[in-house]
Amino acid sequence: MSHDISKIVDSVVRQVLSDGESALKSPKAVKRPIPDRMTLAAAKELIGAVEKKAVEMGVKAVVAVSDASGNVVAVECMDDAYIASYDIAVNKAFTVTSLKMPTKDLAVLAAPGGSLYGIQFTNNGKIVIFGGGEPLMNAGKVIGGLGVSGGTAEQDTKLGEYGKMYFETQM
């Protein structure tokens, strides 16, 4: 047994000396496949990532994640976030799953003369037509929605886009 340990130690020392990197380093993280449905664990991870970015930006946000049907999977309110931001974030997550498009894209379409003029007054007022909502996709299929509210429309849009990018590249 001590002979086996000696071989392992020799191997580690040789590797450290040969390439200058520690053989004891943990292996690089392996990217996981994008989930095929929204789970509570995935929603919590995504919310945590968006909240971290919101802190960096100085935004007190509410972050909501829904499943493919627009039903809430998880919502978190950062300290001192606006009370109204809760419903707005949840409704952004609903909107993007319902219409399969980012909420920022609805502003032009919902303007007078636009092809979706007045859509924000449908679905009991749950359709949001300003930035901060992003559909979460896997293989071209919407599996969930992300809604962020608490900053300006531009800040919410940036946080939503960050969340979508995180979902696509880090999860």
Task: Label the predicted regions.
Residues H3-M171:
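Flexible, solvent-exposed loop/hinge segments and secondary-structure transition points
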